[in-house]
Amino acid sequence: MFSRSTGCTEGNCENGYGTWTYTDLTTYVGEWRDGKKHGKGTVMWPNGYIYEGEFQDSKWHGEGTLTFPDGATYVGEWRDSNMNGQGTFSLADGTVKKGIWKNGELVEPN
């Protein structure tokens, strides 16, 4: 999900709240600090993926929700853009995987 930069299309993308649009039309709307995504924000990809949650130094970090194009969702904790900590992955077919995640893998189901 790597996108090449285009630029700040609205607001303050250095220190504040702004919108950044990438060449592939991926869009980030949210808080910025020192030119990096930091705080609460939303990334929307043209292919239907949406991440809404917390960022630290432009990485998904803290509480957040990733929604997949097929309707599946992961709701929970993130660290360095990976599922890390307590979280729930709900697949489009109704299957639910819940528990402790480490680097994107479910390590302690509950």
Regions found by a protein language model. Give the residues of each.
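Glycine/tyrosine- and acidic-biased, solvent-exposed loop/turn segments at the edges of beta-strands
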Residues: 1-110
